[in-house]
UniProtKB/Swiss-Prot annotation:
This is GMP synthase [glutamine-hydrolyzing]. Its main location: cytoplasm. Pathway: Purine metabolism; GMP biosynthesis; GMP from XMP (L-Gln route): step 1/1. One of its GO terms (cellular component) is cytosol. Catalyzes the conversion of xanthine monophosphate (XMP) to GMP in the presence of glutamine and ATP through an adenyl-XMP intermediate. It catalyses: XMP + L-glutamine + ATP + H2O = GMP + L-glutamate + AMP + diphosphate + 2 H(+). ATP binds at residues 241-247. The keyword NAD does not apply. One of its GO terms (molecular function) is ATP binding.
Length: 541
């Protein structure tokens, strides 16, 4: 919860935890998601995590898939201490091959004669005892999803085959004595029928994990953690944007420490149309949270001048300026509170960081690369005088929404689309100027207004208009113009780790395009982004 390591009771100390070690698969985060859907708490760490550095003992370990070949030089390998921990282990795809590689001797992993991508028919073999537990209640055959080039060519010592496919004679293996299992398919993807049952068998039946990870339980535990961390007189200043993440975080903090929580919104000049006014009304009237709005738009926009092609620099400038303003406001609030019932030091800064933010900001030395610096995770100055408190840091987006409902937050707030901390600045590709902000802001307002009017808002996970760094020729009012291009983006997703573009019908897009071109001065062309994530990210920068 706190990034300085002072959190007295992290979730893995409270809930039984399945540890997922990531070898770089595009599906790894889904393993954690599926386990949490089963009410089993799970955390993901890099595959090269040293067990000696692990602050908890997991109930079980899952080795993820990955884009590597275990036999190649430089391929990532797990800490050998994993196999001395005495807990059940499940290897998925590359994880199976890594397990076989570890046990060595007669085991072999080789490039398959035929790569296997897509659906496959898995046949389950019965051997009795613990070896049958992984495939309990799935039947003798099931449809699974394969995504591999290499495969196991020889069985490791003391293992036996528990499942096969036409192209993978060792599609499922199990240790004869220990609760070690390997599967070549991906149970975490929805294409695998009964995949969640396989994960349940491992986590709940084999690992004996409790199924008590619920938002109702999380609220009680988190409020206790916050109170213990902050203390009886400690105060927290909250970074509030009006999005679902910061709203839920603010409500949780209010429930935990009452008036010792100070909600502050910084108008950075790159908010949505009328955002500051609407957020203030929403939080104060709807949730009983007093909100201080600081208009720092001139400072932010002045500091963003001249940044044309470096989105990371934009994020860092916004992050540095944001913290600078918050530190000054914290001093003012602390001074005003000295002679009140709230007397105490403001030591903490609340942020609505989520688990996908943490995952995307990790820089693994082995299998993974940094995708981008998230505004709630990176880009913060090293000399900041406030410690971060991030009560949502272990949650996925859908869990945050469920938490919001648990806290009694109105549905229209719970289901509000996310809005990034750097705001419209990362939806303007190129230099951020007041004129560019105006154009992007007005286009975005029209797009969202039309989505709501069409009854599509809840069907779409995130939508916005972005301003591209190019101009196009058009004809308006019988005259040639050379004006801006707006790109519309809308996606569907459950956890924001992967996303598909939303398939609007042509009439809807025609209507939005016509309105933007006619109502937003300076725009002559509108395009629709149909890039999924991956390969793209949801935001433009």
């Amino acid at each position: 919860m706190a990034t300085d390591g002072s959190d007295p009771i992290p979730p893995h100390k409270t809930f039984d935890t399945i540890l997922v070690l990531d070898f770089g698969s595009q599906y790894t985060h889904l393993i954690t998601r599926r386990l949490r859907e089963l009410n089993v708490y799970s955390e993901m760490l890099p595959c090269n995590t040293k067990l000696a550095d692990l602050p908890f003992t997991p109930k079980g370990i899952i080795l993820s898939g990955g884009p590597y070949s275990v036999y190649e030089e430089g391929a990532p390998h797990v800490d050998h201490a994993v196999f001395d921990l005495g807990v059940p282990i499940l290897g998925i795809c590359y994880g199976l091959q890594e397990m076989a590689w570890h046990f060595g001797k007669n085991a072999g992993v080789a490039a398959g004669e035929k790569r296997e991508y897509g659906h496959a028919n898995l046949k389950v073999e019965s051997h009795g005892g613990h070896m049958d537990e992984l495939f309990k209640d799935v039947g003798n055959e099931l449809e699974v999803w394969m995504s591999h080039g290499d495969k196991l060519s020889n069985m490791p010592e003391n293992f036996t085959t528990v499942a096969t496919t036409t192209n993978a004679p060792f599609a499922g293996i199990a240790h004869k004595e220990k609760k070690y299992y390997g599967i070549q398919f991906h149970p975490e993807v929805t294409h695998t029928k009964m995949g969640k049952t396989v994960l349940k068998n491992f986590a709940v039946d084999i690992c004996q994990s409790t199924t008590d990870w619920t938002m109702g339980k999380f609220v009680d535990q988190e409020i206790t953690r916050i109170r213990k961390l902050v203390g009886e007189k400690g105060q927290v200043i909250g970074a509030v944007s009006g999005g679902v993440d910061s709203t839920v975080a603010a409500k949780l903090m209010k429930e935990a420490i009452g008036d010792r929580f100070h909600a502050v919104m910084v108008d950075n000049g790159v908010l949505r149309l009328n955002e500051a006014k609407q957020v203030k009304e929403t939080l104060e009237k709807g949730l009983g949270i007093n909100l201080t709005v600081i208009d720092a738009s001139d400072m932010f926009l002045d500091r963003l001048k001249g940044i044309t092609d470096n989105p990371e620099q934009k994020r860092k400038v916004i992050g540095n300026t944001f913290i600078e303003i918050f530190q000054e406001k914290a001093k003012e609030i602390a001074a005003a509170a000295k002679n009140s019932s709230n007397a105490g030091e403001i030591e903490w800064l609340l942020q609505g960081t989520l688990y996908p933010d943490v995952i995307e900001s990790l820089s693994f030395k082995g299998p993974s690369q940094t995708i981008k610096t998230h505004h709630n995770v990176g880009g913060l100055p090293a000399n900041m005088n406030l410690k971060l408190i991030e009560p949502l840091r272990e949650l996925f987006k859908d869990e945050v929404r469920a938490l919001g409902v648990e806290l009694g937050i109105p549905e229209d707030l719970v289901w509000r689309h996310p809005f990034p901390g750097p705001g419209i600045a990362i939806r303007i590709l190129g230099e951020v100027t007041r004129e560019q902000v105006r154009i992007a802001r007005e286009a975005d307002y029209i797009f969202i207004e039309e989505i709501k009017a069409a009854g599509l808002y809840r069907n779409i996970s995130q939508a916005f208009a972005a301003l591209l760094p190019v101009k196009a020729v058009g004809v308006m009012g019988d005259k040639r113009v050379h004006d801006q291009v707006i790109a519309l983006r809308a996606v569907e997703t459950t956890d924001f780790m992967t996303a598909d573009w939303y398939p609007f019908d042509g009439e809807f897009l025609k209507r939005v395009s016509r309105r933007i071109v006619n109502e937003v001065n300076g725009v002559c062309r509108v395009v629709y982004d149909i890039t999924s994530k991956p390969p793209g990210t949801i935001e433009m920068e």
